[in-house]
Amino acid sequence: MPQNEYIELHRKRYGYRLDYHEKKRKKEGREAHERSKKAKKMIGLKAKLYHKQRHAEKIQMKKTIKMHEKRNTKQKNDEKTPQGAVPAYLLDREGQSRAKVLSNMIKQKRKEKAGKWEVPLPKVRAQGETEVLKVIRTGKRKKKAWKRMVTKVCFVGDGFTRKPPKYERFIRPMGLRFKKAHVTHPELKATFCLPILGVKKNPSSPLYTTLGVITKGTVIEVNVSELGLVTQGGKVIWGKYAQVTNNPENDGCINAVLLV
């Protein structure tokens, strides 16, 4: 047997202390508090490295939790494929309920320019930087002014991970993050509440597009799978562009018209 493993040897011979497992459980319970105290007291380069490590751990933990929570996976149905006439767009299903996953074709379409269609609002008032981005002063004496807070409605995807607050330049408040839009179909003359997939183009600035800022005239992509729209080839349409027609920051909701 290797040397210096006397504790393991003792445990093999006589077993654990009677309070060993209880002590271990309590120590693990205290660990979070001790780490928090340590993080608060640390300063300088050590603190930076420690916070970076903690931030990476938290991201990993959140991703693991999210992975366990995922239920919308591809599953086989026990029911057999219905006999008789089946629409063309259901032929490739083979009795499977598919998760709401965007195909590569839609991802490719997202990259195309939004200026392909005639939009309901061809001209809109440009939004100035002072209007959209509020200067946030930071530092002990509030002398630093490099942070900006978005004051308009914005869209943030599901897979978005914030940077550590210390290094985050653009702050997008939770109260201004929207995930759904009221989209009107111009031909059907009906309005649907559809999930937003992304911001295609904000006419005011490319910066607002990357930040996902939604103002009047912005072209957004919405999930139209619930409408049951089909292409000429018989495939279901997942994503379509729509233009925002109201001022969401004033109305508290996003109203848009589908670009057909």
From Swiss-Prot:
Organism of this sequence: Bos taurus (Bovine)
Complex and partners: Component of the pre-66S ribosomal particle.
Region (Disordered): 20-41
Localization annotation: Nucleus, Nucleolus
Pfam families, A to Z: Ribosomal_S8e (PF01201)
GO (cellular component) term, any one: preribosome, large subunit precursor
Listed GO biological process terms: maturation of 5.8S rRNA; maturation of LSU-rRNA
Family statement drawn from the similarity comment of this UniProt entry: Belongs to the eukaryotic ribosomal protein eS8 family. Ribosome biogenesis protein NSA2 subfamily.
Motif annotated as Nuclear localization signal, chain positions: 11-18
In-chain residues carrying the UniProt-annotated modification Phosphothreonine: T81
Glycyl lysine isopeptide (Lys-Gly) (interchain with G-Cter in SUMO2) crosslink residues: K80
Skewed-composition ranges (Basic and acidic residues): 20-34
Name of this chain's protein: Ribosome biogenesis protein NSA2 homolog
Primary gene name: NSA2
Domain of life of the source: Eukaryota
PANTHER family linked: RIBOSOME BIOGENESIS PROTEIN NSA2 HOMOLOG
Described purpose of this protein according to its UniProt entry: Involved in the biogenesis of the 60S ribosomal subunit. May play a part in the quality control of pre-60S particles.
Major place of residence: nucleus
Keyword Ubl conjugation among UniProt keywords: yes
UniProt entry keywords in alphabetical sequence: Isopeptide bond, Nucleus, Phosphoprotein, Ribonucleoprotein, Ribosome biogenesis, rRNA processing, Ubl conjugation
